[in-house]
Amino acid sequence: LVGSEMCIRDRAYIGVLIDDLVTKGVDEPYRMFTSRAEYRILLRQDNADMRLTPKGYEIGLISEERYAHFLQKKSLVESLVAFARRQSVKASEIESYLKSLNSEPLTQGRKLYEVLMRNDVTFRGLKEVLPRLRRFMEEVAITDEAMEEAEIQIKYKGYIEREKFIAEKLHRLENIRIPADFDFFSMNSLTIEARQKLSKIRPETIGRASRIPGVSPADINVLLVKFGR
């Protein structure tokens, strides 16, 4: 309404709620379940501050003090992840720690980042057997909050990157606009149900059209041919 950036489905649950109400409509009270969101790994509880604090600060809902705390946490998380990426560990250095977890021993040296991708391996445990990690965390003053966030980012990196890739593909569809006065009934290649739903809801973009119940992937391909890939 005011020309600002939209709150979209992969950024917050309120984005899911608004998009559902606009594209799907309701015939009963709407309940916001996590199952309604297709990007649940991106919309985790633990990263809510990382996702939403910048936007909250931008529109004046976040105090300077809280924003400064957020920036400090973000910096600590990035520092710890970067440290894990560049530091290598020898098999002998963490042999006893892995044995205590009943985890497969290393056969050769590995980056700390790779070791942390194992289920039971934690920064908290590793710093007890790696003096240089403990020293770094003390020097930089890594908080428990930052340590937890860094660990989650490392362990779930593959899943997070896959969801981001899917979300970015769908974002491209959001950039393909449909004229407000377009006559969907003029397109015989669309199914009758799709023509009816599209004419009623009148989505502004192909991305929104793709989320309307009754509009199939084949219908979306027809729209892509018409309005450009």
Language model region names:
Residues L1-I8:
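Short, small-residue-biased leader/transition segments that mark boundaries at the very start
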Residues R36, L42, A48, T53-E58, ...:
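Extended, charge-enriched "interface" segments that sit outside catalytic cores
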Residues D10-L43, P54:
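A structural-propensity feature for long, helix-poor, extended segments
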